[in-house]
Amino acid sequence: MRSAAFSLPFCDWKCRRRLGAADKWPLLKRSFRILPPLIAGGATTEVKEVEKFADEEDFIKAGGSELFFVKMQERKPMEKQRKIADELTKISSGDPMLDLIVIGCGPAGMSLAAEAGKRGLSVGLIGPDLPFTNNYGVWEDEFKGLGLESCIEHVWQDTIAYLDSSDPILISRAYGRVSRHLLHAELLRRCQETGVGFLDSKVEKIIEASDGSSIVVCEGDLMLPCRLATVASGAASGKLLQYEVGGPRVSVQTAYGVEAEVGNNPYDPRSMVFMDYRDHVKGKIISDEEYPTFLYVMPISSTRVFYEETCLASRNAMPFDRLRSKLMSRLKAMGVSILKIYEEEWSYIPVGGSLPNTEQKNLAFGVAASMVHPATGYSIVRSLSEAPQYASVITNILKRNSNSSQNNVIGSSYNPSVLAWRTLWPQEGKRQRAFFLFGLALILQLDIDGIRIFFQTFFRLPDWMWQGFLGSTLSSAGLIWFAFYMFAIAPNSLRICLIKHLLSDPTGSTMIREYLTL
């Protein structure tokens, strides 16, 4: 559901057929014809993308056929956010070797850099100096638990969902909209206070030196040495990291949104609409190859509203122009008139896919480390909450190595990074992720009626159970209880689908194997 988002072989009832094979790698070399953004207006634009990616999956993670819009989202102007380069000391090639270089300047990278600096490490932050542009939605209690409640700009005490009737499901959990500039300012302040350095540059590669240290190669062949490098540069990090071979194919959650001044808004501004799966365009025939979408609504006031049409997950990204068309059709059918558009949003979240190779020396964090919840698309709370512990582990590794009588840098015969990887992805975490991947594969197979039945059942679970599922706080054993409870209260049609899915989908056997691994 949102960067906040949610995510049977064949079942007997209304399960959609599998789509064909993905577009082949030459897709990268094509030109894409793009519809214009609503605010800018103008003619259709032709864009040629020339960026280099590690492979086809890396290209898909970066945005695939929707890459133009992903780049537009990244580069939206955010005047309230200060440039990182204006606040942090610039890193240069003549500086002493850094303990840690964090590659990537999103919330995950900045939080990890600040936490590592807080623990006494010399830290460098490297990446394009871009603002936070995504509209993050979070459960208020989770952000309060991180001490970041001051970064929430709007809170709805009531959260609701509509599935197939006008009677909402009351979720009874406060939901907040994160202020992008306040969160950016807070993380930047933490980096500044802990002495983190910064370089506004893309990273081309990471080289392991003969003494076991790492050399981060930036644009212009600028080489910066460090004792450890951690990649937090987003999903498309295949040039810098190795990922497990033979894992599940990555799926994608896409959403197109507008924040607008509107007339005849039908939603109560006191409530946040987590999902609205109702069919507002009556009688419309949905293509067999089209995934269902829902409306996500943040009413800032009775007339200023953020509407977002969201495809929970799909094997091939639902195009943004299709989502925009669906959103406008939905709003028109609801009688909503758009008077002024303040902002457009193009949200692209890869979900699922392979874990990083946990035997490699280079570390990862955030989305690059596959920390996105496979079944929901959430990641920011997990990244911010795990940054302190991860920074502590990295600090202990480096201090332990410094105290070694054999070497003052990381020796080539021993890979201490394995300890950090095991902290980030212990066997317990792999079991949980396998369960979520099983849920993602289930969602991918359901049509609109199946999804409605699934969520009707889901929100009948005890609050602590469904909240734990969304927040990744249920243990692997707790997830088994979740499955049993879900099965017990589900209608027979959903039970049959769950059984068939477990027995026939590869994610079922993978989940069982992970649960049996000690």
From Swiss-Prot:
InterPro entries given for it?
Answer: FAD/NAD-bd_sf, Lycopene_cyclase_b/e
List GO BP terms, alphabetically: carotenoid biosynthetic process
- Where in or outside the cell is it found? Plastid, Chloroplast membrane
Q: Which reaction does it catalyse?
A: a carotenoid psi-end group = a carotenoid epsilon-end group
The membrane-spanning stretches of this chain are 435-455, 469-489
| Official protein name in the record | Lycopene epsilon cyclase, chloroplastic
Name the family.
Belongs to the lycopene cyclase family.
- A UniProt-annotated Pfam family: Lycopene_cycl
For binding NAD(+), which residues are annotated in this chain's numbering? 100-128
**Topology relative to the membrane:** Multi-pass membrane protein
Question: Per its UniProt record, what PANTHER family does this chain match?
Answer: LYCOPENE EPSILON CYCLASE, CHLOROPLASTIC, PTHR39757
Q: Does this UniProt record's set of keywords contain Lipoprotein?
A: no
> Which keywords label this protein?
Carotenoid biosynthesis, Chloroplast, Isomerase, Membrane, NAD, Plastid, Transit peptide, Transmembrane, Transmembrane helix
Instruction: Offer an example of a GO molecular function term for this protein.
Output: intramolecular oxidoreductase activity
**UniProt-listed NCBIfam families:** carotene-cycl
Q: What does this protein do?
A: Catalyzes the single epsilon-cyclization reaction which converts lycopene to delta-carotene and neurosporene to alpha-zeacarotene. Required for lutein biosynthesis.
Q: Name one GO cellular component term.
A: chloroplast membrane
The pathway entry for this protein reads as: Carotenoid biosynthesis; alpha-zeacarotene biosynthesis; Carotenoid biosynthesis; delta-carotene biosynthesis
